[in-house]
Amino acid sequence: MLIKKLYPCTLAIVYAFTLMLPLTGFADDEANTDTSTTSSSTTKAVPLEDVQRFSNAIGEIKKYYVKPVDDKELFDNAIRGMLTGLDPHSSYLDEEEFKDLQTSTSGEFGGLGLEVTMEDGVVKVVTPLVDTPAFKAGIKSGDYIIKLGKESVQGLSLKDAVNLMRGKAGSTIQLTILRKGVNKALTFDLIREIIQIKSVQSKIIAPGYGYIRLTQFQALTGKDMLQAIDRLKQQSGGNLKGLILDLRNNPGGLLDSAIQVSDAFLGKDKSGKPETIVSTKGRLPGSDFTALAKGVDVLHNAPMVVLINNGSASAAEIVAGALKDNKRAVILGTTSFGKGSVQTVLPLDEKTGIKLTTALYYTPSGTSIQAQGIVPDIVVNEVEIPKTAAKPADPTGYSEANLSGHLINKNNKEITKAKNFKAQMDELMHNDYQLYAALTVLEGMALANR
């Protein structure tokens, strides 16, 4: 069975995304791919002494282990060990995990809404998904989960830790977390939910300025985003002056979707050649691949600001990197997660498979973001601006408007609108300073383009 779709790696209710390629994803380019680098290493037979050593290990385990062990369990564990010893993103997919993987793009699942990985024997949070129990509770990217309920995660596999987090919707679980900069452990009591993820959210954030948040990259994210842009254009009277694309806490997903999203805002460079979106390099036949822009910029070069943070990973970094390197958008926020590897799902049979790191991806400038991340053009940290008490009226601020019987200005409605907008901006500054900064930059770019 070939997996022809590009599935995000779902750790069931915890929901872990990785960037993956389908086996047939580069079929159109295979004829031009140099596979000479793979021939010597992939066709060489495994040395007989290694096969014998492996067989001896199985024999000793079956004879002397404290209790009888099923052959299937031994082989499953052997495959799992081979994969986990390579890197944090390669893994064995047993029947349950393989099934979860194939159904994960529906956008609905039960759990906490965390993407996690294993680091030094501890579960590390890559990102909490927006509007999920973990996000609402305040769990952050980079947090380390050290206890699940009363059980320590030390010594557990990632799968075992995930299984402990699973449970019936409505049931509770306590997570104990270590956070950088905090000198004591934090505890969070979470209620599991059936999580429905809408990957595209949009609104007019200010007159003439649109806002789109991509929470992940699903199969229909590109199409849904284009429809959202059409709605924003209609809501702005056909004059969309600029767009904020929010990729914060977006753990990634489908490579094809990331390419579609990037392509919507790119076109041809000054020389008339299609702009590069992303390239991948690896040993799998067809994995040396470059994606080029095919269409026309749907915003007709209207200014853009892209928001990223440490929770922006994988496919989200592809989009940010493509728009940054092609100088299509200003990137604002904090450095992204830095996952620059590509995983391919290789079925072993009808029910199991392996998820194997097969390539690294590169931004249009040829830069790998693996363990480095996308560095924003404008660094704006997540800060909380405290709301201060209203200032007393200035006793010297006396004007015509204070005079009894003054003439009424016919533009009072516009003045009221301006005051209301200022109040909205003040509220935005307190609630989401990064978004406030992005809108301020976007408005400045739009004015400069007049």
Stretch-by-stretch model annotation:
Residues 2-11, 15-243, 249-253, 267, ...:
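Flexible, low-complexity junctional segments that flank or bridge functional domains
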